[in-house]
Amino acid sequence: MQDSIEQYMQAVGQQARKASRVLSSASTHTKNNALSAIYTALVNHEPEILAANAVDMQKGRDSHLDSALLDRLELTPTRFKGMLQGLKDVIALTDPIGEITDLAYRPSGIQLGKMRVPLGVIGMIYESRPNVTLEAASLALKSGNAIILRGGSEALQSNKAIATAIQHGLKVAGLPEHAIQVIETADRAAVGQLITMTEYVDVIVPRGGKSLIERISNEARIPVIKHLDGNCHVFIDVEADLHKALPIALNAKTHRYGVCNAMETLLVHEEIAEEFLPRIAELYAEKHVELRGCQETRRILGSSVKTATEEDWYTEYLAPILAIKVVEHIDQAIEHINKYGSHHTDAIVTENYSKVRKFLAEVDSSSVMINASTRFADGFEYGLGAEIGISTDKIHARGPVGLEGLTSQKWIVFGDGQIRH
């Protein structure tokens, strides 16, 4: 069986590499035509896709998947329309491929610049949500990349049905159908093959739980664009405007709990804690948020607040639970964020410009917010359109990864017969 999986994955990789060479030189017009053809194919295949999803949902219920996982797995007609709208949004995005920047003449007479190009072949590994299949496929195609998609086994039938429609659209548009492939086996050995096929795959993008991403990071022989956690912080400075601080702290935690840009720890300057904490605690109580605080937080709010442990400062709850720490000054807040945070998104609320500059310079995160909710750390909110993920790495892409994050740059040189002396 292992040999057959290896042979299957090698064939998938070879086909993807071949298709990527065609896509790399495809015009914007050609790629948009293909995306439009995929849109039409998806509309025509909607009954089959929803029926396949119903099969996955029933299997999930029979396997006793938890309700949150089932919710992410389900495709309703409304969610399907949302997927189609996301595809239209990608069509409307500016194509970064072929863009030439930084043109300048050198003393030798040559003209030097940079040109944006596709990465090549992307391997995408993700869980549960079938809408990711279309999001990732459309972003890859628009940026001139081939993509190999390995969704969770719980969504296998949904993903196969979506892929059938996508490949039909590619054929109609005259592009190679293997530009977008879904791995059609639930065997985990396929993942092991995908993340080590250095001759065929240029980058791996994992989206899912911490254990999945840790495994991919540890075992991959190919560069990985990833984030492990979204342990985000909001620091309420002594010079914060509480008319801003209260709604920001409430929104960052309670707008959505199970997302990577939700706040997990609230830091409050000691000189404003007596005034701020009782007011924000009342708002959290209305939302049934469990509070876990340091000793000073519990002194102010009372023993109904649970004692925060060292583990709490590291935890991404993805739930209505919040850790709260009172700090002496901005330096202690920054030190806490850089020690316990996940380099995802962190915010300060203050009216002091010098503290703003200090926070921006010293907080080591992919997104740093000033007087705004951490929930804005999102490709759509950043004007990137859809995103393939959010990276907390520092190499290549950092923060929400949209079209440009799926590209690289090559140096280009224009000469007129120059030789080097």
UniProtKB/Swiss-Prot annotation:
A single cellular component GO annotation: cytoplasm
Pathway where it operates: Amino-acid biosynthesis; L-proline biosynthesis; L-glutamate 5-semialdehyde from L-glutamate: step 2/2
EC number in record: 1.2.1.41
InterPro entries in UniProt: Ald_DH/histidinol_DH, Ald_DH_C, Ald_DH_N, Aldehyde_DH_dom, G-glutamylP_reductase_CS, Glu-5-SA_DH, GPR_dom
Alphabetical keyword list: Amino-acid biosynthesis, Cytoplasm, NADP, Oxidoreductase, Proline biosynthesis
Similarity comment: family membership: Belongs to the gamma-glutamyl phosphate reductase family.
Primary role: Catalyzes the NADPH-dependent reduction of L-glutamate 5-phosphate into L-glutamate 5-semialdehyde and phosphate. The product spontaneously undergoes cyclization to form 1-pyrroline-5-carboxylate.
Protein name in UniProt: Gamma-glutamyl phosphate reductase
